[in-house]
Amino acid sequence: MATRTNATVTHLSKHLELHQYHPDTIDSGEPRPTVVFLPWMNATQAHANHYRELYAVRGFNVLTVWGSLSYFLWPQWAMPLATELADYLEMQTRGPLVVHSMSVGAYLYAVTLTLIADNPDKYGSLGSRVKGHVYDSIVIGTLEEMARGVSIIVAPKSAMLQQAIRRSCLLYFAATKQHTVVPYNRFIDVVHNSPFKTPKLCFHSYNDVLCLPEAMERMIHHWKDEYDLDITSKMWQNSPHASHLRTDPQTYNRLLNDFLKKVGLDNISLQLSSKL
């Protein structure tokens, strides 16, 4: 079984980290698939390892993308990282790609999607190589709901501080509308109408205040109604934000297995990094 102890880890930059559990090619000589993993804002390496190893034991290598809350508060600051990520995927990877984004990590992916959608000639190969998306506890909703989400991320244990932060965020958004609200709306639209019309696996819960079930269901219905996409959705009644793997690992693993089979990436040869 592949674990973090036998991965070759390459820090490509401050924000990009490659865990190579297996050789670059599979037995057939084809390029090995890579998972692009965008974790939640306060995730640690230990947290990330739980998700990386989900894919390591299934034959994938994993590219982790580390973001910052500042990228959400001022979208223009996220553009260099989005460009770095898109350039790396286009120029430095050759095989199939699966994107697994969590919480605010999905926001950073939305910025990257917007860049890719605006530059189809530059990122042309990605359209055929991105095979599927896993959306886990993504922060989604209205501007009011996003402000509430920021307050919970910053002050998870103080309701009074959350209220102050939420109000400050709304004032901030009103004062910086052209630089924040307008880009947010574009990012949301691009996720709804992604250039990658792939199957999607969505994890969320009824009691998650950051990933509102009504907003998530609206997006899922849009994908199905407008694009006839294959969507698998699992909503728990009671499971903390970005903790569904811990809440119900059996169901999480089963649905992930089914999803990878659906996108044709379920029988990847395992050659652990000790053979590199």
Where are these regions (language model features)?
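Serine-hydrolase catalytic core
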Residues: 163-258, 262-263, 268
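Conserved alpha/beta-hydrolase fold motif
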Residues: 97-103, 133, 202
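Residue-level signal for short, function-critical loop segments
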Residues: 40-41, 139, 206-208
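Short glycine-enriched nucleophile-adjacent loop
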Residues: 108-119, 133
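Catalytic nucleophile-loop/oxyanion-hole region of alpha/beta-hydrolase
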Residues: 68-93
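Short, surface-exposed "cap/lid" segments of acyl-processing enzymes
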Residues: 2-71
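Hydrolase active-site cap/lid region
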Residues: 126-179
